[in-house]
């Protein structure tokens, strides 16, 4: 309980600093000013006719935190205004148009909300998610904008207090806290290139090395001597410290370089805590280590090429998972490789397929290498009855000892209005770590939950939520899960955005 209280106090102090800094920024102007050109910063606008987007011009202002997908408010994107006399970059997709109403987004001295180009190319910034991954462009972002000269700075933070209960001999109960504070800064150079910086910190290590009870979860180690089984490990204090540089080649093409220590390689879908289909779900997917467990890698370099709605990228990164020491930097090895192809066929869809060759991911099995294949489809759409987000993902791990393990995930969120969110997830995994000397096949989990948010102030909201999970696991004495394993969580959440 002492660690949980310390985590809450630390993160609330950090979030208070964010809000205090924002309150000192100049007042916003009236956002309803069609045709208004932003001083020194140029938005992505829509031009009539079939003409392709013009090349980027320097210093456009941006509306989101690339690589840090923020909770969407469930509201439809507002209408745009054509700006025929403005010679800034144009975009053909509706999701890349000028926006005038994104709740929680204060554009500081301009008073305007913009959908701007991404850090890695000439598409809408709302397409960017964790690392260099993509999400549907229609999924909105929110965050706090702070003016910083020629730089655009965005901040976001959240802290949750969770009461967890997992049934049976392999379960347990615990009260703990999870948290993240994220920052992004970007600048467009005179030649049209874009520089981006990102940082993400977490107070999770304060919960203790062993993490929290979660039936059927496995991966990494808590003490350096044994695998963590039926528990979810905490994230490292340092989740991301990265930089990116992109250069436009033409109206629709660009190349980019991304480096992080730690960072996220081009492997898997967006990390679960940033996925638009899982933003409000406090439970870590049990398929995490088949899909997106490499999202914290101590040493990543990614090079990529973007052509309109396609992105091809390759990463060289450290394959070893973070060790049990959650407050330090791990050794950078750059011994593993990943390739990913992403395609956004429409503003509502984001697809990816990726393949990773991972060297010695587990410190307890240093001679065991892994080939990982993932494929996923993420969907987001605003309807008259609310917004819907969903992800379908599959993952395969082929280990160098011949073991072959698969995982399947289907998750979603429904927001009937900005205050309520209902979320659900279904998963199936194959794992030898859950049963020493054998392999559990067909294990799975189905969870359902909801959260009610209350707006406290312009940049603050507080939520109350809960979920219930039904687990499917072998009932043999060696498995020891019992006949009907299940679990539940009750949680509170404070968000600065």
Residue ranges of model-derived segments:
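N-terminal periplasmic/intermembrane-space "pro-region" immediately following the signal or transit peptide
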Residues: 21-158, 162, 171-172, 184-192, ...
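Residue-level signature of outer-membrane beta-barrel architecture
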Residues: 146, 185-189, 247, 304-307, ...
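Repeated loop/turn-to-beta-strand initiation elements of outer-membrane beta-barrel proteins
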Residues: 153, 191-195, 251-255, 309-313, ...
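Transmembrane beta-strands of outer-membrane beta-barrel pores
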Residues: 159-167, 201-207, 261-265, 307-309, ...
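Surface-exposed coil loops of outer-membrane beta-barrel proteins
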Residues: 208-342
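Outer membrane beta-barrel transmembrane domains
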Residues: 355-364, 387-402, 406-413, 417-457, ...
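Outer-membrane beta-barrel "beta-signal"
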Residues: 448, 482-497
